[in-house]
């Protein structure tokens, strides 16, 4: 078997705020909690993806201070441009919108970006050749 990416592990300054962010904006759910080294370790996953890919989040990290033109991010696919616009509106109301919706040439597509409570950027896109529903799109 070749290596398979199964998780990303992140230390975050405010565990509860990060859980709420990923539940609210990404549709992820806590699937596991346990004590760990004087704190708590939490696993989060998208419904149906629990055994494929998870975020492991733990308290204790420092906030990331990324520049607005730093494109380091986690990427999530959405079902339509309207879904990107709706999510961007909700993020703007919550004060976490970093990149307003914009169009880029293929394979980037239509996307917006949010800042999670730890300072990580999270992209929400439509029209990329990645994720559910993209099987008919060519890989560039």
From Swiss-Prot:
InterPro entries assigned to the protein according to its UniProt record, in alphabetical order: Cadmium-induced_rsp, Glyas_Bleomycin-R_OHBP_Dase, Glyas_Fos-R_dOase_dom, VOC
Signal sequence segment: none
Transmembrane regions: none
Gene3D superfamilies according to UniProt: 2,3-Dihydroxybiphenyl 1,2-Dioxygenase, domain 1 (3.10.180.10)
UniProt domain VOC: residue ranges: 4-127
Pfam family for this entry, one: Glyoxalase
GO biological process: response to cadmium ion
CDD domains: VOC
Family matches, as PANTHER family: CADMIUM-INDUCED PROTEIN CADI
Protein name (database record): Uncharacterized protein PA2024
């Amino acid at each position: 078997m070749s290596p398979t990416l199964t998780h990303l592990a992140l230390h975050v300054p405010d565990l509860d705020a990060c859980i709420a962010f990923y539940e609210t904006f990404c549709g992820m759910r806590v699937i596991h909690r346990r004590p760990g080294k004087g704190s708590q370790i939490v696993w989060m996953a998208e419904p149906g993806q629990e055994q494929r890919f998870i975020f492991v989040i733990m308290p204790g990290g420092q906030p990331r201070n990324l520049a607005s033109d730093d494109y380091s991010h986690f990427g999530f696919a959405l079902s339509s441009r309207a879904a990107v616009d709706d999510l961007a509106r909700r993020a703007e109301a919550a004060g976490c919108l970093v990149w307003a919706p914009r169009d880029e040439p293929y394979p980037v597509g239509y996307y917006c970006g949010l800042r999670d409570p730890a300072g990580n950027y999270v992209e929400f896109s439509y029209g990329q050749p990645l994720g559910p529903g993209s099987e008919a799109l060519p890989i560039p």
